[in-house]
Curated annotation (Swiss-Prot):
Keywords: Host-virus interaction, Nucleus, Ubl conjugation pathway
Family: Belongs to the SKP1 family.
UniProt GO cellular component terms: cytoplasm; nucleus
Any Pfam family hit: Skp1
Functional description taken from the UniProt entry: Involved in ubiquitination and subsequent proteasomal degradation of target proteins. Together with CUL1, a RING-box and a F-box protein, it forms a SCF E3 ubiquitin ligase complex. The functional specificity of this complex depends on the type of F-box protein. In the SCF complex, it serves as an adapter that links the F-box protein to CUL1.
Molecular function terms, GO-annotated: cullin family protein binding
Pathway membership, UniProt: Protein modification; protein ubiquitination
Quaternary structure, from the entry: Part of a SCF (SKP1-CUL1-F-box protein) E3 ubiquitin-protein ligase complex. Interacts with rice black streaked dwarf virus RBSDV protein P7-2. Is able to form the SCF complex together with CUL1 and the viral P7-2 protein. Interacts with D3.
Keyword Nucleus on entry: yes
Name assigned to this protein: SKP1-like protein 5
Compartment(s) where it occurs, according to its Swiss-Prot or TrEMBL record: Nucleus
Spans annotated as Interaction with the F-box domain of F-box proteins: 106-164
Keyword Ubl conjugation appears in the UniProt entry: no
Length: 165
């Protein structure tokens, strides 16, 4: 059973999320609702047998849920200043992951529609590549240049503004 009432409060209800590799994650409705995709499924009553997430592996889903749990708890906190400082500190350590996990977090946050996580991961990526050359970025993310020199030159001309210092 996916939606089990544990108390009178709807936030106490548990939702079962199922990763692409079949792992099951029981989370509160408040945590699950950080994802607009899952929130819509809850509203539509589509969570009875669990919510399959075919585009998110268990290791990535666990990381996303760590983020959702902290942010859902912070949303319920009363002291705004303390909450903001705690989240800022949490986010800084949370997003300090290897490039593969960062890439997977971006994909998962986009798929699950968790805007704040997507913003955090994209901003971190932007910070990582800021000031780097095209080749340094390729090396950092393991991107193979499959353009011919002519194609590359054409792209540079079309996007000249991006290559200005």
């Amino acid at each position: 059973m996916a939606a089990v009432k544990e108390g009178a409060d709807a936030g106490d209800s548990k939702i079962l999320l199922i990763s692409s590799d079949g792992q099951h994650f029981q989370v509160t409705e408040a945590e699950a609702s950080m994802s607009k995709l899952v929130s819509n499924m809850i509203e539509d009553g589509c969570t009875e047998n669990g919510v399959p997430l075919p585009n998110v592996a268990s290791n990535v889903l666990a990381k996303v849920l760590e983020y959702c749990k902290k942010h859902a708890a912070a949303a319920a906190a009363e002291d705004v200043a303390v909450k903001d400082q705690e989240l800022k500190s949490f986010d800084a350590s949370f997003i300090d992951v290897d490039n593969t996990m960062l890439f997977n977090l971006i994909l998962a946050a986009n798929y699950l529609n968790v805007p704040s996580l997507l913003d955090l991961a994209c901003q971190h990526t932007a910070d990582l590549i800021k000031g780097k050359t095209v080749q340094e970025i390729r090396d950092m993310f393991g991107i193979v240049n499959d353009f011919t020199p002519e194609e590359e030159e054409e792209i540079r001309k079309e996007n000249e503004w991006a290559f200005e210092n």
